[in-house]
């Protein structure tokens, strides 16, 4: 890899499972406990925003109990090494956790959103939040009630 200057790596559930993050599709995974259409679709959010907020509150709470593993840290070190010699590493992840960032990676793209981010369904403003949310919360930008949803 000494001649490679710009690398893109795709990661998925396996990298964070080692840290103790529940996967969605494995036996006993989250989709066995919560039907995807109820907690991870616009229709599910419209039908029962409280259920969706509670699901993501549970996921954020679980995230507070885990740490990045050796793979997250190794990718962050690779990124730093490439950057030092004028290169770059982009991590594209299917994961909604922030373990790549906690491990030190900076150039991370989350394909399916991120647990620690909210999106206002009215004005489109995004912001970081590690706290529990509810359907009664207001957007920090437009102040509209019931605006924030998981990103």
Q: What are these model-derived regions, one by one?
A:
Residues 1-151:
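Conserved catalytic core of sirtuin-type NAD+-dependent deacylases
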């Amino acid at each position: 890899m000494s001649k490679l200057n710009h690398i893109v790596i795709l990661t998925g559930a396996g990298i964070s499972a080692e840290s103790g993050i529940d996967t969605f599709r494995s036996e006993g995974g989250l989709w066995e406990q919560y039907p995807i259409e109820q907690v991870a679709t616009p229709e599910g959010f419209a039908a029962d925003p409280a259920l969706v907020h509670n699901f993501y509150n549970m996921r954020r709470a679980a995230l507070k109990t885990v740490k990045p593993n050796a793979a997250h840290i190794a990718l962050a070190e690779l990124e730093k090494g490439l950057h030092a010699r004028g290169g770059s590493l982009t991590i594209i992840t299917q994961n909604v956790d922030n373990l790549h960032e906690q491990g030190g990676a900076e150039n991370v793209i989350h394909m399916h959103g991120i647990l620690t981010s909210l999106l206002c369904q009215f004005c489109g403003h995004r912001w970081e939040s590690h706290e529990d949310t509810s359907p009664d919360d207001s957007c920090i930008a437009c102040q509209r009630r019931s605006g924030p949803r998981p990103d």
